[in-house]
Amino acid sequence: MSISRRAVLATAAAALPAVTLLGSVHDAVAAPGTTYYIAEDGDDQAAGTSESTPWQSVNKVVTAINAGQIVRGDTIVFKRGQTFYGQFTDLSGLQGEGRITFGAYGSGEKPRIMGYKVLNKPEAWKNIGGNQWQIELVEGNYSGNTSTEDANVGFLLLDSAFHGVKKFSVGELRNDLEFHSDERNRMLTVWSEANPSTRGDLRITVNGRIFQAVSNMTIQDLDLIGCGGHGIQVRDVTGVEVLRNRIRHIGGSVLYGTTRYGNGVEVYLGGSDVLVEDNIIHDVYDVATTIQGHQILKTGGEAPVLRLGSSNVHFRKNYITRCSQSFEIWVAGPEDRSQADTTSAKAGIRTCSFTDNHCEDAGIGSWGQEVRPNPDEGGVHLLSYGEGLPIELSITGNQFIKAKNAYMYRSPEHRSSISIDRNVIQLAAGQKLQQQRSETIEQHAAWSQATGFDANSTFTVAG
């Protein structure tokens, strides 16, 4: 993303009074436990418990959690205006009781937590013939995020420009900066006339999450950048707050086969009591925000916990732009297609909402939309693939401004009780409201009558 586009984003977000770009009074306040400070000029051998003795790295924080030094009730704060590489993919070793908080201290811009691996070593590349260059993604061949050895690359970023065309064999590479990643052998191959690392600031994302949330967790006032999987995933945990963060440059890694994925904030079925508020989310391969997932009705093996549904999940006052979709909902029974539980009081999605969010440019200027194999399912604000479980969800008070394809993608046969109303919808003249239906924005009254959606919403045609 160029500097000018970054400025445009900041200006647009600043126009929204509900969204806080730079925190000050909202910074992490010391909890009853210990506060740990992280700064670029810190020392991982220091105490870490004061601004004058900060630690330096994400890896130190992860190590301290696994060693039982950082426990529940503690607060971890990163210095504003500074950059830290790594990710918090596995916090399962966290001990104790109470809330764990990740936040910021000092003044200036939000601290940047980057998942990028930086490919700044030309000597690490090997030309394997023609314009094909290969690098082994092993220690010593890159800098930046060393928290993971994953080699499932999501996209390349060269001098702030996205390059997301991923091929599934080396032989398919034909054009500049197309790439193939071999996860098993940890090998990345890139089509380039010159050594890729000599062309500028080259970075890659790899699979994972910047934060895999745990129960009773607050993530606030951070700038989370660069991951091939999700920005934040909430799965089988409760009591999670995601507040006033910026989440960007997310997705593109392979989920299975040739299917790529990656969401800004994903609440997977089983996550409950979640608040996602006042965040800025942009440049995501798939969807900015979502509640989704399969039930687990029998435990064992890779299914250690029962999973019936999610409740009390709320997305509000977020600013979303340049994602393939803004909000997605789908829920289903077990993956083995056995009988779903639709009668339990905890089944499906209960008492959830998507309210007062400002969503614009769905699929417009979106790197993910440009490279996805199913573009008709992107470029929409609202997306629903399946509604096989009970859904109690309200989508109200939002602004949905401009989309590449349509306002929503939803199968007409779905009949769950989703309440969608009192929104502002702005599309281009002649643009469809729903991909699977014929009504255009000019025919919104007929569409609302047929679907039951947005009867009291405001529809405008973009000038």
Residue ranges and their predicted role:
Residues 7-27:
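N-terminal export signals
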Residues 29-32:
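Low-complexity, acidic Ser/Thr/Pro-rich repeat tracts that form intrinsically disordered stalk/linker regions
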Residues 35-235, 253-258, 267, 300-302, ...:
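Extracellular polysaccharide-degrading/modifying enzymes targeting complex plant/algal/animal polysaccharides
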Residues 365-368, 406-408, 431-436, 455-460:
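Acidic/polar loop patches that form or flank catalytic/metal-binding clefts of enzymes
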Residues 215-226, 238-253, 261-264, 271-326, ...:
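Right-handed parallel beta-helix
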Residues 3-9, 107:
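N-terminal export leaders
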Residues 401-405, 409-412, 418-439:
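Leucine-rich solenoid repeat modules
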Residues 120, 124-140, 175-176, 204-209, ...:
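Extracellular beta-strand/beta-solenoid scaffold signature
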